[in-house]
């Protein structure tokens, strides 16, 4: 019988090999907290000492929360979703992630919630990645000056407060003054650029609806679809029925989707409708989290809430891809008071504002643009050269007309020059009126404004101005298509071009019949005397 020998070296080697190759079963080390308070869309959580600011927390029913307050003993978080199932004592776990949203071309033509989930019933969205909501805006060296036009299709805006790609232009005014209409028409006006298929002309649009009625959001979507603009537009919807947390986050979601396209070298237009309601939602969340209130009960960082959002709109340098994101934030005022807290904050952040006035709106002037306090600080360098050429005197002429109109209201006798100026001003005011969902092309605006400011419409009755303009532009597109194309594609108009436009207008006037049955051509000799 063979003798059993035990070799200590073999046993030692076997033990060493086993120890070195041993891998324990993956033991999950997870911090688990407890809900101590829940309600009104917020929750207080104890027992997560390593949680980060703006980290996502997961509740027992799968609902997510966003950590906003990191206090000594507990965390104050805003619940992202339905909060009725969250109760005291329930466990809460960390996710180790910050809030992000899926991005990509699949968002075009879709309606999504503030977390990027589709809510239009058209199935899942094909995405190309994810982007964090809280990202730094482009630095100074990554930017370039605004120099390309972003036309709204409104003569009053494009002539007097022009907007450039990468600019932040505030639309401000009381409720029911046409703010959303101006923004939606700007989206519709990008339709012809989109259909060219040229990436340098195409503009992807994002409409962020914050605290709007569901019916209003549906009507905006319907208007975009009816006018062929939904195919290049994304709607981020946080209706009035959504929790305050969603209304606070919606603009950042839209901005993240747009930034992805901007950094890919594409052009984006984003509309925030409206930031007053976002500030109200943030105030509600902050007060529920016991943050100290400041002016008008807003928290101390409400300026930063909007500045870090709007600073993301930029025109990138060529080295960064030359993309752009143009922002049109909307702010609602009370009784035309632009000196309130939120309006003054956003005015100081943006590059200009279009002030829409309820008195002008009710008087039938639409868009109801108050020329006196509306301004574009950087858009002048981006304005189409032909438009800049013809609109130079428009603002001054209108301001003088308003002053003269107020003076004439006293019934004073006016000299012939003042009467002439008053009559031309009335025609210019009528000329600047436009119907909703009917934005005008650049060449049509240029011809229309030039004809008005140079007195080519002085003999047209005020009641016939808009019909004269419509029929004149139809005549020019029919008879002088080459001339209209040269205005659109060229820069500053030459003397020959201006002469050709003047001759075409003169030829049309001879065949235009006024509402009282007269031909303008018949009155021309007497008007010249």
Curated annotation (Swiss-Prot):
Compartments in which it is found: Cell membrane
Gene Ontology biological-process entries: proton motive force-driven ATP synthesis
Signal peptide interval: none
Mode of membrane association: Peripheral membrane protein
Site note Required for activity, residues: 374
Assigned GO CC terms: plasma membrane; proton-transporting ATP synthase complex
Key words of the record: ATP synthesis, ATP-binding, Cell membrane, CF(1), Hydrogen ion transport, Ion transport, Membrane, Nucleotide-binding, Translocase, Transport
Keyword Translocase annotated: yes
Binding site for ATP: 173-180
Protein's UniProt keywords contain Transport: yes
Gene3D superfamilies: 2.40.30.20, ATP synthase alpha/beta chain, C-terminal domain, P-loop containing nucleotide triphosphate hydrolases
Highest taxon of the lineage: Bacteria
Enzyme Commission number: 7.1.2.2
Catalytic function, reaction form: ATP + H2O + 4 H(+)(in) = ADP + phosphate + 5 H(+)(out)
Single annotated GO MF: ATP binding
Subunit record text: F-type ATPases have 2 components, CF(1) - the catalytic core - and CF(0) - the membrane proton channel. CF(1) has five subunits: alpha(3), beta(3), gamma(1), delta(1), epsilon(1). CF(0) has three main subunits: a(1), b(2) and c(9-12). The alpha and beta chains form an alternating ring which encloses part of the gamma chain. CF(1) is attached to CF(0) by a central stalk formed by the gamma and epsilon chains, while a peripheral stalk is formed by the delta and b chains.
Entry-linked HAMAP family: ATP_synth_alpha_bact
UniProt record similarity statement: Belongs to the ATPase alpha/beta chains family.
Record function comment: Produces ATP from ADP in the presence of a proton gradient across the membrane. The alpha chain is a regulatory subunit.
Name of this protein: ATP synthase subunit alpha
Taxonomic placement: Bacteria, Bacillati, Actinomycetota, Actinomycetes, Kitasatosporales
This protein's encoding gene: atpA
């Amino acid at each position: 019988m063979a003798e059993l020998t035990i070799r200590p070296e073999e046993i030692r080697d076997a033990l060493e090999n086993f120890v070195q190759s041993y891998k324990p079963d993956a033991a999950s080390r997870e911090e688990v907290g407890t809900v101590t308070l829940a309600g009104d869309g917020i929750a207080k959580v104890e027992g997560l000492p390593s949680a980060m600011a703006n980290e996502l927390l997961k509740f027992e029913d799968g609902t997510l929360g966003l950590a906003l307050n990191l206090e000594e003993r507990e965390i104050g978080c805003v619940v992202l979703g339905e909060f009725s199932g969250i109760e005291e004592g329930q466990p809460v776990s960390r996710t180790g992630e910050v809030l992000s949203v899926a991005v990509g071309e699949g968002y075009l033509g879709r309606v999504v919630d503030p977390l990027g989930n589709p809510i239009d019933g058209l199935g899942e969205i094909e995405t190309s990645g994810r982007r964090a909501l809280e990202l730094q805006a482009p630095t100074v060296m990554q930017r370039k000056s605004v120099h390309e036009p972003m036309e709204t299709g409104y003569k009053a805006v494009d002539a007097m407060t022009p907007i450039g790609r990468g600019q932040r232009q505030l639309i401000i005014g009381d409720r029911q003054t046409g703010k959303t209409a101006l923004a939606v028409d700007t989206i519709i006006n990008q339709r012809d650029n989109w259909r060219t298929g040229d990436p340098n002309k195409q503009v992807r649009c994002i409409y962020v609806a914050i605290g709007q009625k569901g019916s209003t959001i549906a009507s905006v979507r319907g208007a975009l679809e009816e006018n062929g603009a939904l195919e290049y537009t994304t709607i981020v919807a946080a209706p009035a029925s959504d929790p305050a947390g969603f209304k606070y986050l919606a603009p950042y979601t839209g901005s993240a989707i747009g930034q992805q396209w901007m950094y890919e070298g594409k052009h984006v237009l984003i509309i925030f409708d409206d930031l007053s309601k976002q500030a109200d939602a943030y105030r509600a969340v902050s007060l529920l989290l016991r943050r100290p209130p400041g002016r008008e009960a807003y928290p101390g960082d409400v300026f930063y809430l909007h500045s870090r959002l709007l600073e993301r709109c930029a025109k990138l340098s060529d080295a960064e891809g030359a993309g752009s994101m143009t922002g049109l934030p909307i702010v609602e005022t009370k009784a035309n008071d632009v000196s309130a807290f939120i309006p003054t904050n956003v005015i100081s952040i943006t590059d200009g504002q279009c002030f829409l006035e309820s008195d002008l709106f009710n008087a039938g002037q639409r868009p109801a643009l108050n020329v006196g306090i509306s301004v574009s600080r950087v858009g002048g360098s981006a304005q189409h050269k032909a438009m800049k050429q013809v609109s130079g005197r428009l603002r001054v002429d209108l301001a003088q007309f308003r002053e003269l109109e107020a003076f004439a209201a006293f019934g004073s006798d006016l000299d012939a020059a003042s009467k002439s100026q008053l009559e031309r001003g009335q025609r210019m005011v009528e000329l600047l009126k436009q119907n909703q969902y009917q934005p005008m092309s650049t060449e049509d605006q240029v011809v229309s404004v030039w004809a008005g400011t140079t007195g080519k419409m002085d003999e047209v009755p005020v009641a016939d101005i808009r019909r004269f303009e419509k029929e004149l532009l139809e005549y020019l597109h029919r008879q002088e298509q080459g001339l209209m194309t040269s205005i659109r594609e060229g820069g500053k108009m030459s003397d020959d071009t201006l002469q050709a436009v003047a001759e075409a207008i003169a030829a049309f006037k001879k065949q235009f019949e006024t509402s009282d049955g007269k031909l303008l051509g018949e009155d021309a000799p007497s008007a010249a005397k």
